[in-house]
Amino acid sequence: MGRISFVIQDFNELSEEVSKYFIFLQDLEQGKVKLIKEIQGNNKANKIDVELENTLKGSAYLLLYNLIESTMKNAIEAIFQELQEKDVSFDKIRPELKKIILVNLKGRNPDKILEKIQDISLDIVSIGFNKEELFTGNIDSKLIRETAKKYGFDSQTDDKKRTNDKISYLRLIKNNRNDLAHGNRPFGDVGKSKTADELIEIKKTIVEYLKGILENIETYIDNEEYLDSTNTP
């Protein structure tokens, strides 16, 4: 099983965790979830107030954004792990990947690079990748398309009818995540604009989109599309 298979497995597990939270939000909004308070030895059920409900809905955007960013980071990492495991040398990879590696090397310490290099044609590929430099809080549909173009994998997914939804949802998730992360807006303010049902619809659309992107990257790796086609005999 290739590295991308583990990425897909992790994505499915994380998606399931996120789904459970969104179902909880739906139950909460429908009054199926209550707080149990003990008063003088007696338990009393109280409906959760709207402000707390909105705060919890605001947190949903962080879960969605983390799902998107972690999935894309892990998928890109799988490409480089494939190159390392198959000992693919720098001169054999496609020009787009060469550019990425060379740009990444600009910020590296030359002394540390020399410490790690034994075979420059192979080691430069692994040294020229840093997972933590990918998608630092700014991922949306535009960046995913640009990343696909940079690496050479397909950014189109099967569900073309919902392209506008995907674009607007990804932008909404990114903007809300950044507002929350930077303290620009309170969680309750972010959460009050959507119902739980609307959030579930957003989640379903994003999960299906990410599945399609992962399938495209899996095809890219399986078909060795990371190789320079001009080197193919």
Describe each region flagged by the PLM.
Residues 46, 50-66, 163, 170, ...:
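Short, charged/polar micro-motifs that form catalytic or ligand-binding hotspots
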Residues 1-62, 76, 91-93:
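Charged alpha-helical initiation segments
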Residues 29-30, 69, 73, 88, ...:
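Amphipathic alpha-helical interaction segments
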Residues 2-30, 34, 153-233:
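Polyanionic, low-complexity intrinsically disordered segments
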Residues 68-72, 178-181:
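Short alpha-helix boundary/capping elements
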Residues 63-64, 71-161, 166:
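Helix-loop junctions and short alpha-helical segments
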Residues 36-44, 83-102, 198-208, 225-233:
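Charge-rich, acidic-biased intrinsically disordered regions
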